């Protein structure tokens, strides 16, 4: 099974490191992670992903107003029917990607909340509009905590998927 993770990029942020912690530990003979990145430049984890057998695809930056962005997204899903599991990590704007995946026949569409709030600026109202649509297009809702799930999915049912942390890296060492 190939799972397509939709991310901004694979730099060394919290979400990206969590995904890599899972990726390093899964049985890659049974499940393979591929990544759809919204940046054109290479990211920190890209080489490691490729070494482990993952593929990296690039599309333009996520822009809810761009016809070019949306057509590129639809083209991607139409050209890659092998992806029957799409796991989207795009916060409030995940519904845009989930809708395209649904219309192109992707059977399992996961939205994942990684935060429990959003800056209350001018963009917030727009993001609320898209956030409310997430449960309509997702088949599964995940959150890193109860708070993150309640914030992003409101009253919809979601599952908490705890962040993968390599605890051995944080064990006390007298040598340090």
Predicted segments, located by residue:
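Membrane-interface segments of envelope glycosyltransferases acting on lipid-linked substrates or membrane lipids
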Residues: 1-176
